[in-house]
């Protein structure tokens, strides 16, 4: 593979990762399809995907740095809570409660989960995840009990964490599982999405570091330019995707995302079967 060709592949996959990582459409499904079409598969490809995920995580940190510092009691500039707003406050405890279920299951069944990374499982996960998005839109309370992040209860945070366990099924979509769970628990669509992004930082960071540690032997100095291009591309595109997504969900439901998931599932079937 020539240098220019590998850098082009890195840029394309970085765009795919950045666009899909935090949308409820399954980045795994997209990466499997695009990687296959580009002929970029195998151990190096898996390690590359782990590295560019760090770029997406960095985008969330940049977007929500004020809120993330606030979770540990460090506030910059204006306070997060204004007069007339909820007397509640999103805390680190909410994040920990949201992390525990999937973190425990992920650590215990890490190798088993990795064995599920194949097109047929991803295809089924895309469909089931789409059905969950539709169910969340149809069954959510008419008036959310938690309109904003600071209105969320510990119970809601923990239940969202339980829904996040569904994302251990490759192709399900972590954001799709957590946002759907939040809406079913009475959290507004926007607040559930914000919480999903905040929850992504420790969850994805932990999983990515673990994967990177186990994949370290597949890294070589010759891969650094390719990995760097993928990382930077994923970071920039993820920033744009997150901002656009948060504006978009103020105006539309998640039904279009569910339909899109069904289309991607069909694409997986066509490409691999």
UniProtKB/Swiss-Prot annotation:
Keywords: Antibiotic resistance, Cell inner membrane, Cell membrane, Cell shape, Cell wall biogenesis/degradation, Hydrolase, Membrane, Peptidoglycan synthesis, Transmembrane, Transmembrane helix. Belongs to the UppP family. Catalyzes the dephosphorylation of undecaprenyl diphosphate (UPP). Confers resistance to bacitracin. It is an enzyme of class 3 (hydrolase). It comes from the Bacteria. It is found in: Cell inner membrane. The chain crosses the membrane at residues 6-26, 45-65, 90-110, 116-136, 190-210, 222-242, 252-272. GO terms for biological process: cell wall organization; peptidoglycan biosynthetic process; regulation of cell shape; response to antibiotic. Its EC number is 3.6.1.27. Pfam families: BacA. One of its GO terms (cellular component) is plasma membrane. Its main location: membrane. It catalyses: di-trans,octa-cis-undecaprenyl diphosphate + H2O = di-trans,octa-cis-undecaprenyl phosphate + phosphate + H(+). NCBIfam families: PRK00281.1-1, PRK00281.1-2, PRK00281.1-4, undec_PP_bacA. One of its GO terms (molecular function) is undecaprenyl-diphosphatase activity. This is Undecaprenyl-diphosphatase. It comes from Salmonella arizonae (strain ATCC BAA-731 / CDC346-86 / RSK2980). The gene is uppP. It is a multi-pass membrane protein. Bacitracin is thought to be involved in the inhibition of peptidoglycan synthesis by sequestering undecaprenyl diphosphate, thereby reducing the pool of lipid carrier available.
């Amino acid at each position: 593979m020539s240098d220019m060709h590998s850098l082009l592949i890195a840029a394309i996959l970085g765009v795919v990762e950045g666009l899909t990582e935090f949308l409820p459409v399954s980045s795994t499904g997209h990466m499997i399809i695009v990687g296959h079409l580009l002929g970029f598969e195998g151990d190096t490809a898996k390690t590359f995907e782990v590295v560019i995920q760090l770029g997406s995580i960095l985008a969330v940190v940049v977007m929500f740095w004020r809120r993330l510092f606030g979770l540990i009691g460090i506030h910059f500039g204006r306070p997060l809570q204004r007069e007339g707003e909820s007397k509640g406050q999103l805390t680190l405890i909410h994040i920990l409660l949201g992390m525990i279920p999937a973190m425990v299951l992920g650590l215990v069944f890490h190798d088993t989960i990795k064995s599920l990374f194949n097109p047929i499982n991803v295809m089924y996960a895309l469909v089931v995840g789409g059905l969950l998005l539709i169910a969340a839109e149809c069954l959510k309370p008419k008036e959310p009990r938690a309109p904003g992040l600071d209105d969320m209860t510990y119970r809601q945070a923990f239940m969202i964490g339980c829904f996040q366990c569904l994302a251990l099924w490759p192709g399900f979509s972590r954001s799709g599982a957590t946002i759907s769970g939040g809406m079913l628990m009475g959290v507004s669509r926007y607040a559930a999405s914000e919480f999903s992004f905040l929850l992504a930082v420790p969850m994805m960071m932990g999983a990515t570091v673990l994967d990177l540690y186990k994949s370290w032997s597949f890294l070589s100095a010759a891969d650094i330019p390719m990995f760097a291009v993928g990382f930077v591309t994923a970071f920039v595109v993820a920033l744009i995707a997150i901002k656009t997504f948060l504006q978009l969900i103020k105006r539309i439901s998640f039904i279009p995302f569910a339909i899109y998931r069904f289309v991607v599932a069909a694409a997986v079937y066509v490409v691999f079967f």
